[in-house]
Amino acid sequence: MRYCLKSRQKKELLAEADEIRVAARDYRQAVDLMEEYPAARIIVDIDDLDIKWSILQALNEKYPGRLTLCLAVGDVLEEFKNFEYFFSFYLNTWQDLNSAVSLGVNEGFIGAPLFFQQDKIKERYPNFKVRAIPNRAATGNVARADFAHGTWIRPEDTEFYEPYVSCFEFASPSAEIEETVYKIYKRREWRGNINVLIPQLDYNTNNQFIAKEIMPTRLNCNQTCETRNSCHLCDTALKWQATIEEYRRQKEEKRTVKSTSMVTD
C-alpha cells in the first residue's frame, strides 16, 4: 500500500511518504518538495485557476511523472491537459467512473455504491488506480442513517484491499491527528475503540474484537444493505460487539458498587 501525507507534516514523516499532497494555497511549495523528497510523487490541489501555471509547467517538464494535479473542478480545461490529474471529489457510480476515464483520468477516489464493486472496477479498468480515505465512513450532503454501510476500512483489513486500492490518505483536521492515524494504518493494527479511529461510525466498539473474517465480504458486496435492505453484516458485527462492550461496562459498574457497599458496611 502507498501512503499520501499532507505537505505540512513533519519532515521525517514526509521522508517516508510515497506521495505528498500540497494545498492549493501552498502550490509554490512543490518546487522545494520535488528536490527535498526525490522519491515522492507530488500532488497539488487545484481549487481555481488563480495560480502561476508557468511554475507547475516548469516542474512538470523538469520532473516528468512526479507531478500530479488534484482538481476540484469537473471541467478539464486547456491548462490541465499537459499534466497528470485526478478529481478531488468521489466517483460514486459507473457513469462517474466512465466519464472520468473518457477524460483521460486513470485514478481517483471511489465512493459508494461503486466502492463495493472492487472486482468489477479491476476487471473493466485494470490500470485504474483507486484511492481511498480509510478513516472516513462516507461523504456527501445527505445525512446517513448508519455509517456502518460506508466506505471505511480498518487498519487490519488493508491486506484485503491491496489488490484493488493503490493509495491511502487520511481525513484529519490537524497534522498531529494525521500522524497518529497514518502510523496506526501503517502498523495495520488498532486495539482501541473503532469510533476514535473512524469517528463517523459512532459505535462504541473495541476494534480488536470485531471478527476479521467478515471484512473481505465488503469488497464486492454491491452494498446490498442499501440496494435490497439485505445482508447487514457490517452493522450487525459492530452492534454486536458494542452490545458486548456495554454489557461488560454495566457488569463492571455493578461489581464496583457492590465492592464499595461491602467496604462501607
Walk through the language-model features, giving the residues of each.
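Active-site pocket-lining/capping segments in soluble small-molecule metabolic enzymes
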Residues: 1-96, 103-265
